[in-house]
Amino acid sequence: MTNAPDTHVMAQRPRWRLFLRVLAARLDAVLDADQRDALLRDVGADMARGAALPPVSTLDALEDEINEVLSDLGWGRASLALDEAARVLSIVHTHLPTIGSIEGRRGPWLSAVLEGLYTSWLAQQPHAAPGLVARRTARRTKDVLVLTYGKASAMTDSPS
């Protein structure tokens, strides 16, 4: 038996966790929560442009395209459901990596990035209405985040 590390297992491990925790701490130190979230939404929007989704004609196809990119990122999965009565799209995102700052609690620090990512991806689709945004509306468990895509004026305060 050898004590050599299993390179396949090592390749599967996240290698950015310490960097992201230190970056989170630095951002938390120089920005208030609203500024930090705005910056992270912009990062998500930039990511959406870098990983643009093809135009699709069904919600199921959109969910598949989103999940393909999320899988490549190692950022979990999304389930999409249209709430016709409320005129919003519900996004249930599971298994987002939990990154917090060194000093802060661990949690969905990257959720603001998801807001920008989903806002931009959905806006890129054919027949997308202008001015709609994705915002966190609930957290069911540590690794389940619910976002709503709709008019900003209809959104309630989002949980941190």
Describe each model-derived feature in a short phrase.
Residues 136-158:
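C-terminal edge-of-domain segments
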Residues 84-140:
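Short, hydrophobic/π-rich interface segment
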Residues 1-90, 95-109, 157-160:
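N-terminal accessory segment detector
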